[in-house]
Each structure stands twice: as structure tokens, then as C-alpha cells.
């Protein structure tokens, strides 16, 4: 059992290269839920389809949320119930 057992993880920028790597690292673990938080609905849809083709069971652990890290309220809403966050967004330092 790991520290991530039965926990919820959120990946900001989850459809990018680093976000994909984080998702793949945790997908086949005892984590309860992985939230992908990103602005790009098309990339989320593509990722959802790839996960479904790979394994419907694993795909059921992933929840997709459209949002922008520059919008504090959307981040707060998405974080409700989250135990760990991986921040995989690039290029927002000036916005924060």
C-alpha cells in the first residue's frame, strides 16, 4: 500500500507531455481518482478515448475538468476533495 492509496490526485496541465507522464505513472496504482485539469477540451477528449481503448477499468479512475489555472475560482472548485496536486502547466508565472 502506498501513500497514494485511496487518494485523489489532480494534474494541472494534464493533457501535456509532463501531465501525460504523471497520469501514466499513477494510472495503474491503488489511487482512487485522477483529475485532469486543463483548458483544451479537444486534448481531453482525445486522452479520454485513448484511455478507454487501453482499459475501460483504468479510464474509470480519471475525471476530466475544463479550467484555467489563471482563474483562482476554477482551481478551487476543481481541488475540492483533492489530496495531492501535480502542477504540470508551463508559462503561467506572470499570471500568478
Where are these regions (language model features)?
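NAD(P)H-binding glycine-rich loop region in Rossmannoid oxidoreductase-like domains
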Residues: 31, 51-96
Amino acid at each position: 500500500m502506498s501513500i497514494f492509496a485511496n487518494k485523489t490526485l489532480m494534474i494541472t496541465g494534464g493533457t501535456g507531455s509532463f501531465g501525460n507522464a504523471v497520469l501514466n505513472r499513477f494510472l495503474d496504482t491503488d489511487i482512487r481518482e485522477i483529475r485532469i485539469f486543463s483548458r483544451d477540451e479537444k486534448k481531453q477528449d482525445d486522452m479520454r478515448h485513448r484511455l478507454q481503448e487501453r482499459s475501460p477499468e483504468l479510464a474509470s479512475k480519471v475525471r476530466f475538468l475544463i479550467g484555467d489555472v489563471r482563474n483562482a475560482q476554477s482551481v478551487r472548485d476543481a481541488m475540492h476533495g483533492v489530496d495531492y496536486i501535480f502542477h504540470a502547466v508551463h508559462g503561467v508565472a506572470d499570471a500568478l
